[in-house]
């Protein structure tokens, strides 16, 4: 038997499945070319529940140069540092992800998770 929260999540997923998708017209061919050029590419799905829309932004993993720039700028202003990350990793997608503050902020939160996708272990020899 599902609890109330699980039921609400299922209902929300059903509603969101009907949202129109805005992805900037990115095709499978374009995504494949990005993968060949940049290696790993991620899609960030942003659901704007107030507008009833789903926006997709495509990003590459940050390079060492990008991470260095983000680190340097973030010392003065964390939001500007996140903007550096966004601009340097953005490949394409819904133009609103670049221009609407709420959508962009949501995408930035997801980009922060890119740093947590690899895990390390240190072993004494």
Predicted feature locations:
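Short, charged/polar N-terminal "headpieces" of proteins
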Residues: 1-62
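Short, surface-exposed, charged amphipathic helix/loop patches that serve as local interaction elements
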Residues: 46-125
């Amino acid at each position: 038997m599902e609890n109330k929260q699980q039921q609400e999540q299922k209902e929300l997923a059903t509603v969101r499945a009907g949202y129109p998708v805005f992805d900037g017209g990115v095709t499978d061919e374009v995504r494949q070319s990005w993968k060949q050029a940049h290696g790993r590419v991620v899609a960030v799905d942003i659901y704007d529940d107030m507008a009833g829309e789903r926006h997709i932004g495509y990003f590459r993993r940050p390079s060492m140069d990008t991470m260095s720039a983000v680190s340097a700028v973030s010392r003065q202003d964390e939001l500007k540092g996140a903007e550096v990350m966004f601009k340097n990793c953005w490949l394409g997608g819904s133009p609103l992800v670049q221009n609407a503050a709420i959508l962009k902020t949501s995408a930035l939160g997801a980009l922060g998770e890119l740093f947590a996708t690899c895990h390390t272990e240190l072993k004494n020899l």
